[in-house]
Amino acid sequence: TPLKESTCYLPKETGPCVGYFFRYY
């Protein structure tokens, strides 16, 4: 079942934590 988890990554410019990826188990 694919679980949608949130991940934090910092872009080249300073910004908030954004980003998503699907993790399969």
From Swiss-Prot:
Keywords: Protease inhibitor, Secreted, Serine protease inhibitor. Disulfide bonds: none annotated. Residues 7-25 form the BPTI/Kunitz inhibitor domain. InterPro entries: Kunitz_BPTI_sf. Coiled coil: none annotated. It comes from the Eukaryota. SUPFAM superfamilies: BPTI-like. The record marks 18-19 as: Reactive bond. It is found in: Secreted. The keyword Magnesium does not apply. One of its GO terms (molecular function) is serine-type endopeptidase inhibitor activity. GO terms for cellular component: extracellular region. Inhibits trypsin, human plasma kallikrein and human neutrophil elastase. This is Kunitz-type serine protease inhibitor 4.
